[in-house]
Amino acid sequence: MSVRIGHARVAASAHWSVAALAALAWGASAAAPAGAADVDAQGTPPLRIVGDGIPEPLTATAGDAARGRALIVARASANCVLCHAIPDPALRFAGDLGPSLAGIGTRLRASQLRLRVADNLRVNPASAMPSYYKVAGLDRVAAPYAGKPILTASEVEDVVAYLTTLR
């Protein structure tokens, strides 16, 4: 007997691995089927989730930590500081709704950070934090933003680069 996990079929077993259970819960598969589309309907490459993260960067170029910091503190874009405090004495009025980002680079790997920024609802469906790169399935979006991610793939990588410096 086998069960389907995403596009993959795996043998049913009384002994499931943590990764298999996570993939089942998140609807992810370890590998996409041959001929799978390289982009979704909105032109956004699909996220390849493995275990509890996205191991591969979303872009061919490395993220820039300085640009990532600018995005995190920018009230008009990512606006992370609305809910999260960061260890920056120059920053005033950071939020405390979400966890502090101080030391996040020691607590989470880049792959885990990438998933949380790109599609946080996969990690915590009850979270108020938006999925910054996901567009599919979002139904309460203002018309000018419909079908567009909050952050581009390179901006996600910039944010991840900055978060990994917070040790």
Where are these regions (language model features)?
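The canonical Cys-X-X-Cys-His
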Residues: 68, 77-87, 113, 129, ...
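C-terminal capping alpha-helices of c-type cytochrome domains
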Residues: 122-125, 132-167
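Sequence context surrounding c-type heme c attachment/ligation sites in exported
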Residues: 66-81, 92-95, 146-154
